[in-house]
């Protein structure tokens, strides 16, 4: 028997290994009879459908998530006037911070996301009126 000290991800382990001597190849083991298949688990209940987002007022425009990610910060609030190109919020996707900007001069009608919230592509984030 040989002893080794192995380090994995910074943790040291003492390992004992049996030494195998060269010998004639062992006969193939006999096949064991197949076990009966395990019963399948009941399917998980379907998740409840997400609540529909509130309708957008006539003449308003929504700024939608261009990609899935996490909202790092929201730079605007309802009632705030914004100019074209002004940062509305910061969306982190694939470890990159993406500034989501106002597409035109407008007033923020509603902010539908908050910091640390996860969004999917196409989710409404800000409503501009």
From Swiss-Prot:
Annotated control of activity: Completely inhibited by avidin.
InterPro entries: Biotin_BS, Biotin_Carboxyl_Carrier/Decarb, Biotin_lipoyl, Single_hybrid_motif
Residue segments, region Disordered: 24-58
Gene3D superfamilies: 2.40.50.100
Highest taxon listed in the record's lineage: Bacteria
Gene (UniProt): mmdC
Keywords for this protein: Biotin, Cell membrane, Ion transport, Membrane, Sodium, Sodium transport, Translocase, Transport
GO annotation (BP), single: sodium ion transport
Chain ranges of the Biotinyl-binding domain: 51-129
Protein name per its UniProtKB record: Methylmalonyl-CoA decarboxylase subunit gamma
Entry-annotated residues carrying N6-biotinyllysine: 95
Record flagged with keyword Nucleus: no
EC identifiers of the protein: 7.2.4.3
Catalytic activity: (S)-methylmalonyl-CoA + Na(+)(in) + H(+)(out) = propanoyl-CoA + Na(+)(out) + CO2
Compositionally biased residues, Low complexity: 24-39, 49-58
PROSITE patterns (alphabetical): BIOTIN, BIOTINYL_LIPOYL
Protein's organism: Veillonella parvula
């Amino acid at each position: 028997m040989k002893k080794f000290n192995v380090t994995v991800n910074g943790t040291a382990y003492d390992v004992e290994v049996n030494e195998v001597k060269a010998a004639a190849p062992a006969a193939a083991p006999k096949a064991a009879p197949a076990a009966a298949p395990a019963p399948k688990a009941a399917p998980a209940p379907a998740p409840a459908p997400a609540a529909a987002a509130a309708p957008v007022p006539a003449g308003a425009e929504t700024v939608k998530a261009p990609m899935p990610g996490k909202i790092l910060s929201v730079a605007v609030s309802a009632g705030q006037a914004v100019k074209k190109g002004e940062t509305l919020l910061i969306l982190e996707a694939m470890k990159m911070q993406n500034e989501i900007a106002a597409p035109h001069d407008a007033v923020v009608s509603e902010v539908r996301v908050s910091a640390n919230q996860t969004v999917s592509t196409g989710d409404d984030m800000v409503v501009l009126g």
